[in-house]
Amino acid sequence: MTDKVRLTTMVQAAGUAAKLGPAGLEEAIHDITRSDDPNLIVGVEGAEDAGIYRIGENLALVETTDIITPLVDDPFTFGRIAAANALSDVYAMGGRPVTAMNLAFFPACSLPTSVLAAILAGGSAALKEAGTCLVGGHTVEDDELKFGLAVTGLIDPARVVRNCTARPGDLIVITKPLGTGIISTAIKAEMIEPEVEAEATRWMTTLNAKAADLMVACRATAATDVTGFGFIGHACEMALGAKVSFKIELARVPVIPGVPALIDDGMVPAGCYRNRQHYEQHVSGNSGDPLLPLFDPQTSGGLLITFAPDDARTFLSRAGKEGLFAACIGEVEPAGGTPIVFV
């Protein structure tokens, strides 16, 4: 029965596009203050991908959680994407995920438990690939289907990669193409070509593990993963946090083939426009529809990384030899004008 259920029709928004928008989130967490625990390395004070808590001289915990709604119709694939998406925050910090707990919100009155079983199986498959132990979980009966994980990783505190430490002169690299939110909208509307859906699914089920290992080995100066706030939103967080400007060559930003045609067909999620409304004040050099894929909320998106130029070239060379996708899309400049400048 699971192959007959269209999960995307049962939710209002798909994947990371279902997250609270940046403006609402900023207002909600404005009064939350950082803990004064001396072992807390990274907390709630910034827009980091995960928290970091020291438990030894050379060891710290990386802690994160992520929950999404279905953005594909197949339950197993949805579970796998949700797990890859949750693991990604640990990878973005340079950590190694070691344990995870399932978080499932399930409409038991409208779906058979076989659907939940398939979702959990997909999540477990991604965890097995990552070498991460599933240690438990929690379920809630809910009107809308959601699934995600709480993930704990390990890291050497001296090797944490933050999102606020890019330096002028660094080169900017991305490790996956954009457009999964737009494609998910088309899947829900049944206006998607099978090959475009397959390509998006391939990217969303690809773990950021190998790219993260190489990022750390090549001495990344800063990194984040591109998710619900879109490429521009997360690039803004990096630039504002480091008090620099990101000069981006728009033509070099990779987009999944088929996305421009879907934009022409109106397959743009509300989250894309919400991101544009919030972040367009931080952008100069271009505007309008060409930027829509860059505002698009991504699910299980790639890593956005900065390196010193020689290290960037090493990363790109090694990525090519190891069969990893990577594109150099710009450079970091001293702050001046807007945080994001397109050329």
Curated annotation (Swiss-Prot):
What does the Swiss-Prot or TrEMBL cofactor note state? Binds 1 Mg(2+) ion per monomer.
Record EC number: 2.7.9.3
Q: Which residues form the active site?
A: U16
Q: Give the Pfam families listed for this entry.
A: AIRS (PF00586), AIRS_C (PF02769)
Q: What does this protein do?
A: Synthesizes selenophosphate from selenide and ATP.
Q: Which positions does the site annotation Important for catalytic activity cover?
A: K19
* Gene3D superfamilies membership: PurM-like C-terminal domain, PurM-like, N-terminal domain
Under the heading NCBIfam families, the entry gives: PRK00943.1 (NF002098), selD (TIGR00476)
Q: What subunit structure does UniProt give?
A: Homodimer.
Name-wise, this protein is: Selenide, water dikinase
Which Gene Ontology molecular function entries are recorded, alphabetically?
Answer: ATP binding; magnesium ion binding; selenide, water dikinase activity
Cofactor(s) listed: Mg(2+)
Query: What is the native source organism of this protein?
Result: Citrifermentans bemidjiense (strain ATCC BAA-1014 / DSM 16622 / JCM 12645 / Bem) (Geobacter bemidjiensis)
Q: Which reaction does it catalyse?
A: hydrogenselenide + ATP + H2O = selenophosphate + AMP + phosphate + 2 H(+)
**Kinase: present as a keyword of the record?**
yes
Q: A GO CC term?
A: cytoplasm
Q: Where does Mg(2+) bind?
A: D49, D89, D225
Question: Does 4Fe-4S appear among the keywords?
Answer: no
Q: Where does ATP bind?
A: K19, G46, A47, E48, D66, D89, G137, H138, T139
**Which GO terms are recorded in the biological process aspect for this UniProt protein?**
selenocysteine biosynthetic process
Record family assignment: Belongs to the selenophosphate synthase 1 family. Class I subfamily.
Tell me the keywords, alphabetical order: ATP-binding, Kinase, Magnesium, Metal-binding, Nucleotide-binding, Selenium, Selenocysteine, Transferase
